[in-house]
Amino acid sequence: MIKLKNFTELNSQEIELIFKWRNHPDINQFMKTKYIDFEEHLRFLKKLHQDSSKKYFLVFQDEQIIGVIDFVNITTKSCEFGLYAKPNLKGVGQILMNEIIKYAFENLKVNTLKAYVFKDNRKALKLYQQNHFTIYDEDKDFYHICLKQSDCKALPS
């Protein structure tokens, strides 16, 4: 069973765990901000209480923490998402992706789900394309991808 825990409800151990993951080289190599200090991390978590355009979740599978999913720039029409798995944990990308798609379309009720993917993050791009995301633009560093809810309704659940 999958459970989402909002970052605004994390306990002290979870706050520290997320901080360590966020600065782990396997994770931050594909982040725009490469390193954050603990004070910055705490400020970020505090700001989430007042910012309705962002939602971050710790993802549990059968009581085990498996990763993080997030939604930013949330509007009535669209949002951007991000995800990362627990360092050294393999095979959970699709589980995290399923939760992103479900939460965005069922809870946030957006029409379009978007992300920016580092061009050298082939693993992530493959996962997104397997989930019917399409590249709609690109720049020097990123592919811009999206999935429309109308495309998703035709997919098997």
UniProtKB/Swiss-Prot annotation:
GO molecular function: acyltransferase activity, transferring groups other than amino-acyl groups
EC number of the protein: 2.3.1.-
Keywords assigned by UniProt, alphabetized: Acyltransferase, Transferase
Root EC class: transferase
N-acetyltransferase domain location: 5-152
Disulfide bonds: none
Protein role: Catalyzes the third step in the biosynthesis of pseudaminic acid, a sialic-acid-like sugar that is used to modify flagellin.
Name of the featured protein: Acetyltransferase PseH
Gene that encodes it: pseH
